[in-house]
């Protein structure tokens, strides 16, 4: 696509992602120009959002949603209908950010020279095999070259605005060192039986006793295997491997990085429970390895800070702006992200009034009900969703889990088995369902395990066939009279 070619000649802007993901520049430019040519009142009536009175059209929004979904699929993501709501929300947010940035660039009267536009246009033309093909694409998009130049001018204005922000960012040597350093902690975790002060104190005392044993010379790995409740690390003697800053919860990270190699920590409390930590090793920012990695790490840190600065800048612009989103489902999704579940439920209900046959909208409402601990209301919505989209295994899985949450075990198992049946070739789905049924001690787990075995058998057959085909091809390519290495 043309826009993908253009991206190679422009700076990446992570905050403005909507159009970048695969949409044609000609299409996007044409949409923007056609939007301007239509009356503002007409466009506002057909818009997904208004940004300081400036409309974002439904057509542009829908094209960007489609482009973003295609991009995720190209990146190997497993896109299912339940994920589309989040893509729609992110697309609207990106288009709003884009509009805010363009409005700010115009407000600042950022100048763009004819030479700069010429350079950008030349880069586009050079990406086509011939001038004729460029003109055909231009005409097919309903654009004139003058209109395209106007669109490119706006793009350059936004790039210059973001360049000003980028140039304000500095990375210190201390930041580079901290980002490079890693520690290798081992830990023993004890989880309180419940949230009562007595249970927490009992868990703390247990960890304190273990810490005292360790200081007296007890083997850390042996105690971790015997007492740690972190199933992911206990069999490794509590060893978490090398981890950098930002990878661990705050309290654990601060304690681990404060230790010397071989030192045992005091009791550390986190949301997971109580820990005692031993530092096994430390990777310092020194030597040839650090020097080789330093420049790339500095560039990565700068990009992170730039993106954070852009996000903060856009948030400030939005605080000073009037933004109206005109889709109840997208509003509800945003409220869910903010943790305002009660308000989200009302907007999901309003959305359903206009789209009562949307199974996935019902699933979103059900998820909100579950957040409110309204399990029966969630089940009612999911039962309707399954009736509307019976072939979707994810909906059956959600319904099964809701039944289990309501202690309706037989109904839950029945729905889980339907989910398994409708996704017979989905290895991850089968593993998830098998794990649930095994934990419940249900004999139906064997049905799912048979499906897992069949998936593995088919995979091994395909792998064997591929290896044989590659072997035959290698033999055919070996010159006669020579010996393959």
What is the predicted function of each stretch?
Residues 46-51, 264-270:
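Short acidic-hydrophobic surface loop/beta-edge motif
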Residues 63-87, 150-167, 175-216, 229-250, ...:
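Well-structured core secondary-structure elements of compact alpha/beta domains
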Residues 1-89, 140, 319-320, 326-485:
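Short, low-structural-confidence N-terminal segments
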Residues 125-133, 221, 230-237, 249-251:
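Secretory-pathway/luminal and periplasmic proteins that interact with or process carbohydrate-rich
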Residues 12-27, 81-118, 123, 131-171, ...:
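Solvent-exposed, amphipathic alpha-helical "stalk/arm" or coiled-coil-like segments used as scaffolds
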Residues 256-260:
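Soluble sensory domains of the PAS superfamily and closely related sensory modules
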């Amino acid at each position: 696509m043309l826009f993908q070619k253009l991206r190679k000649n422009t700076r990446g802007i992570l905050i403005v992602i909507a159009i970048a993901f695969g949409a044609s520049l000609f299409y996007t430019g044409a949409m923007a120009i056609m939007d301007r040519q239509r009356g503002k009142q007409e466009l506002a009536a057909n818009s997904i959002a208004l940004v300081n009175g400036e409309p974002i059209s439904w057509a542009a929004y829908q094209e960007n949603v489609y482009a973003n979904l295609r991009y995720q699929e190209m990146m190997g993501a497993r896109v299912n209908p339940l994920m589309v709501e989040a893509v729609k929300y992110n697309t609207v947010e990106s288009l709003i950010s884009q509009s805010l940035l363009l409005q700010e660039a115009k407000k600042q009267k950022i100048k763009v020279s004819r030479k700069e536009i010429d350079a950008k246009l030349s880069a586009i033309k050079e990406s086509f095999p011939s001038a004729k093909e460029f003109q055909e694409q231009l005409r097919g998009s309903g654009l004139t070259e003058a209109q395209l130049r106007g669109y490119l001018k706006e793009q350059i204005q936004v790039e210059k605005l973001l360049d000003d922000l980028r140039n304000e960012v500095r990375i210190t040597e201390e930041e580079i060192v901290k980002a490079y350093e890693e520690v290798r902690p081992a830990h023993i975790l004890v989880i309180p039986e419940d949230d009562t002060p007595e249970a927490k104190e009992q868990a703390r005392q247990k960890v304190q006793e273990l810490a005292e044993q360790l200081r007296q010379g007890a083997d850390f790995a042996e105690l971790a295997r015997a007492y740690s409740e972190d199933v992911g690390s206990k069999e490794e003697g509590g060893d978490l491997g090398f981890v950098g800053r930002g990878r661990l919860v705050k309290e654990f990270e601060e304690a681990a990085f404060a230790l010397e190699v071989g030192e045992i920590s005091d009791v550390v409390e986190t949301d997971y429970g109580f820990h005692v930590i031993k530092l096994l090793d430390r990777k310092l920012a020194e030597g040839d390895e650090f020097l080789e990695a330093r420049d790339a790490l500095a560039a990565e840190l700068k990009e992170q800070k730039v993106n954070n600065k852009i996000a903060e800048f856009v948030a400030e612009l939005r605080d000073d702006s009037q933004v109206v989103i005109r889709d109840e489902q997208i509003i509800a999704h945003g409220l869910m992200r903010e943790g305002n579940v009660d308000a989200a439920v009302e907007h999901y209900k309003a959305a359903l009034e206009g789209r009562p046959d949307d199974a996935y909208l019902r699933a979103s409402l059900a998820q909100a009900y579950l957040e409110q601990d309204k399990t029966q209301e969630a089940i009612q919505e999911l039962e309707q969703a399954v009736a509307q989209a019976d072939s979707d295994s994810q909906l059956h899985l959600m319904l099964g889990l809701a039944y289990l949450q309501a202690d309706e075990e037989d109904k839950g198992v029945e729905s889980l088995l339907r989910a398994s049946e409708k996704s017979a070739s989905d290895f991850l789905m089968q593993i998830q369902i098998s794990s649930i049924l095994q934990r419940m001690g249900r004999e139906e787990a064997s049905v799912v395990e048979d499906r897992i075995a069949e998936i593995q058998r088919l995979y091994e057959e395909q792998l064997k066939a591929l290896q044989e085909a590659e072997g035959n091809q290698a033999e055919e390519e070996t010159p006669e009279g020579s010996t393959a290495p």
